[in-house]
Structures are given as C-alpha cells and as structure tokens.
Design a protein with these regions (language model features):
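Positively charged, small/polar-rich N-terminal and surface patches that mediate targeting and assembly
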Residues: 1-96
Length: 96
C-alpha cells in the first residue's frame, strides 16, 4: 500500500504506529515531488511517499487506520496485490 505525508516526522510517526499496531511488517519512506491540480491551480509539493508492506487480509483495517492518522484532507491511499518471493512472504507473514 502507498500513501503520502507532508513531513518526514509525520511519515516516521505513521510508520512506527503501523508496525506497533501490527498492520505492517515494513515501511519505506522516500522524499518525492508531487505535481497536481488543487482548487483550479497546479501545485507542486515536496512530500514523503510511504510504502507499506502488509498482508492482503489487513487491507481494510489498514485503510481505516490511515484515514484516521493522516494529516491530509484527501489522503492518497493506493493498494495493489503483489506477488513476492516466498522467503520474503514467510518473513512478512511471521512478523505481523
């Protein structure tokens, strides 16, 4: 799952909460530039992309939790089912 946050501090806090609440086994954070339309203007914002590694069965709980803790009015929450190497999946499965 992928979401974004406005600051590294918020992104790091979100990552720690997701792992503590056992909604994710690993969270990656990287700085990005986003260009988008908002209120009829084209905006450019520096923000932080958060990639959340989790189990498919936790998707709904994860989405609900992200909606509660995000700082955005309209949060980006993207999800897709991925295939992965079995050792990684086993680690993910045992960690959550």
């Amino acid at each position: 799952m992928i979401t974004t946050e406005s600051s590294k501090k918020n992104a790091s806090q979100m990552a720690k909460l997701l792992i503590q609440k056992k909604l994710a086994t690993c969270v990656s954070i990287k700085q990005i530039s986003s260009i988008y339309k908002w209120d009829n203007d084209i905006k450019k914002t520096e923000e932080f992309e958060i990639t959340i590694k989790s189990k498919p069965e936790l998707k709904d709980g994860l989405i609900n939790f992200l909606k509660k803790i995000t700082t955005y009015d309209v949060p980006q929450i993207l999800y897709k089912k991925y295939n992965t190497e079995m050792k990684y999946f086993d680690w993910l499965d045992k960690t959550i």
